[in-house]
C-alpha cells in the first residue's frame, strides 16, 4: 500500500474539471500557438479555488503547454536548417499522447506530472 492509496479521491466534479484543464489545450487547433495556453489558463483560473486537485492539475497543464509553446518556437527557428519540421511533428505527437494520458489520469483522480516540463507557474 502506497501513500497515494491512502489519499481519498477528489470529487467527480473536481476530477472532470482537472481532466478538462488538460484537454482544453486542444483549443490549439482553433488558435495555433496561443489556444493551447489560453484553454488551460482560463479553466484553471475559473476553477482553481474549487478543489486543490483542480488547482494542481491546472498548473501542471499550463506549465506543460507553456513548455510546449517554447519548444515549438525553437523548432520554428530550426526550420531554417530543415531539422525543425521533423522535430515539430515529433514534439506535437509526443505532446498529444502526454495530454491524453494526463487527462485520463486526472479523470481517475490520480495526479499527473508531465515529463520534460519547466514548472514556470508555481
What is each stretch, according to the model?
Residues 1-14, 115, 119-122:
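Low-complexity, intrinsically disordered extramembrane tails and loops of integral membrane proteins
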Residues 9-12, 16, 56, 79-82, ...:
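Juxtamembrane loop-transmembrane helix junctions in multi-pass integral membrane proteins
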Residues 11-14, 33-36, 48, 52:
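Residues at secondary-structure transition points
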Residues 19-38, 63-99:
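Hydrophobic alpha-helical transmembrane segments in multi-pass membrane proteins
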Residues 39-44:
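Hydrophobic transmembrane alpha-helices of multi-pass, membrane-embedded glycosylation machinery
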Residues 47-69, 104-113:
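Amphipathic, cytosolic membrane-interfacial segments at TM-TM junctions
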Residues 94-122:
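Juxtamembrane transition segments at transmembrane-helix termini in multipass membrane proteins
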Amino acid at each position: 500500500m502506497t501513500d497515494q492509496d491512502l489519499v481519498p479521491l477528489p470529487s467527480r466534479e473536481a476530477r472532470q474539471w482537472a481532466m478538462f484543464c488538460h484537454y482544453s489545450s486542444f483549443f490549439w487547433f482553433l488558435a495555433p500557438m496561443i489556444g493551447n495556453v489560453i484553454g488551460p489558463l482560463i479553466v484553471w483560473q475559473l476553477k482553481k479555488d474549487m478543489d486543490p486537485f483542480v488547482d494542481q492539475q491546472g498548473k501542471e497543464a499550463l506549465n506543460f503547454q507553456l513548455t510546449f509553446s517554447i519548444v515549438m518556437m525553437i523548432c520554428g527557428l530550426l526550420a531554417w536548417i530543415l531539422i525543425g519540421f521533423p522535430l515539430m511533428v515529433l514534439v506535437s505527437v509526443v505532446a498529444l499522447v502526454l495530454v491524453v494520458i494526463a487527462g485520463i489520469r486526472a479523470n481517475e483522480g490520480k495526479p499527473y506530472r508531465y515529463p520534460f516540463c519547466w514548472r514556470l507557474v508555481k
